[in-house]
Amino acid sequence: MNPSAAVIFCLILLGLSGTQGIPLARTVRCNCIHIDDGPVRMRAIGKLEIIPASLSCPRVEIIATMKKNDEQRCLNPESKTIKNLMKAFSQKRSKRAP
């Protein structure tokens, strides 16, 4: 093999190995694909999880797990109903804490 061809071949291999770990596009990964704006009864919620905005997902996510069937519903944090629900949930929680 020609020495200059071997050098070019090695440079190409080095260039390819350097680009292997670089992502082509940044993907946004949020937990909630569909956001529910419908009413939710506080008694029906078993667990309420608030996930703040981060680098992987630019929006705040509120995930409610229902008591009856463990169904998870993504709630709209901008909805007036959900804001009232969050306020009631935090008041209920603060009353329980000693």
From Swiss-Prot:
Induction (UniProt): By interferon gamma.
GO cellular component: external side of plasma membrane; extracellular space
Modification sites for Citrulline: R26
MF (Gene Ontology): chemoattractant activity; chemokine activity; CXCR3 chemokine receptor binding; heparin binding
Disulfide bonds: C30-C57, C32-C74
Deletion consequences: CXCL10-deficient mice possess a significantly reduced or delayed infiltration of NK and HSV-1-specific CD8+ T cells into herpes virus-infected tissue. In consequence, the antiviral response is delayed.
Oligomer and partners: Monomer, dimer, and tetramer. Interacts with CXCR3 (via N-terminus).
Tissue-wise expression: Expressed in the spleen, thymus, lymph nodes and liver. Expressed in astrocytes, microglia, and neurons.
Function: Pro-inflammatory cytokine that is involved in a wide variety of processes such as chemotaxis, differentiation, and activation of peripheral immune cells, regulation of cell growth, apoptosis and modulation of angiostatic effects. Plays thereby an important role during viral infections by stimulating the activation and migration of immune cells to the infected sites.
Family statement: Belongs to the intercrine alpha (chemokine CxC) family.
Keyword entries, A-Z: Chemotaxis, Citrullination, Cytokine, Disulfide bond, Inflammatory response, Secreted, Signal
Domain of life: Eukaryota
Lineage, opening ranks: Eukaryota, Metazoa, Chordata, Craniata, Vertebrata
Biological process, per Gene Ontology: adenylate cyclase-activating G protein-coupled receptor signaling pathway; antiviral innate immune response; cellular response to interleukin-17; cellular response to lipopolysaccharide; cellular response to virus; chemokine-mediated signaling pathway; chemotaxis; defense response to virus
Pfam families: IL8
Subcellular location: Secreted
Signal peptide: 1-21
Gene3D superfamilies per the UniProt record, alphabetical: 2.40.50.40
Protein name, per record: C-X-C motif chemokine 10
InterPro entries reported in the protein's UniProt record: Chemokine_b/g/d, Chemokine_CXC, Chemokine_CXC_CS, Chemokine_IL8-like_dom, CXC_Chemokine_domain, Interleukin_8-like_sf
